[in-house]
């Protein structure tokens, strides 16, 4: 009798969930589309899958991390913010939350994610913007591949490194502070590393996006960048250095906007984005490090790598350290 009752309850709950899903889908279809502002790149496979599976149109607007807050806040204050869903590094969404730009929504699709990924009812973490040393495996000998972050200070890499601007790129600023707090034993050791890296005269670009190209071409040999490009730039001769220290990264977050023009489509899109199907696509086709249990990108060695989510920096900290790094790296 108890088994029959349990089975009945389970079937009833399943029916309710199905009805809720259909209701949301119907409402989203009536709204017509979901607008997605994101700093993440190469997400077209998920956008296409969402459209095919739901019949709801999805529009993707890519905004670089350095311009995200300014663009979003300016549009919001002018009453022209058209995003239904926003995705960016956690510090960026925390800033938007502080401006009242995010709505409360706890997606059922994230029920299996680790508890620490739910910051609150407004922000859900789904991945880590992992940063590593990416090198040209055809031009760098295996014996020369860095084994520690400190190896970047070796004079052999002078004028051979490319990285996002440490004075303005929030994720790079956070990564450098992450090294200070998670890798180096003292501030003196960390400062020695910074000055040694700066002495090697890295090329600075606006964000991670442009970092692989100079390494692919051989103009530079190493990029402080993301392993995902090994997937998205294949068959380019890229590999990542298996350094002894942990790989660090800023948590990637997603949220619905407080004045979403299409609120039901926004919920449907966020649910889809956090689903295992979408996370599989994000990992396997885009190379992202996601937080859905058991899902990893098809990059040799990544599934066993130690990846540490570094803490979020406040806007004041980003500005403070960005200004200091401009001086250390002589950014002009």
Per-region residue spans from a language model:
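Bacterial N-terminal signal peptides
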Residues: 6-15
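Extracytoplasmic ligand-binding site segments that recognize negatively charged/polar headgroups
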Residues: 37-48, 59-219
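Extracellular/periplasmic bilobal clamshell ligand-binding domains
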Residues: 278, 297-332
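A bilobed periplasmic-binding-protein/Venus flytrap-type ligand-binding module shared by bacterial periplasmic
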Residues: 134-139, 177-181, 250-262, 281-282
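Short, polar/charged alpha-helical segment
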Residues: 21-57, 133, 284
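A ligand-binding cleft/hinge motif common to bilobed small-molecule-binding domains
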Residues: 90-95, 216-239
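Periplasmic-binding protein-like
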Residues: 115, 128-129, 159-167, 193-198, 204-205, 273-295, ...
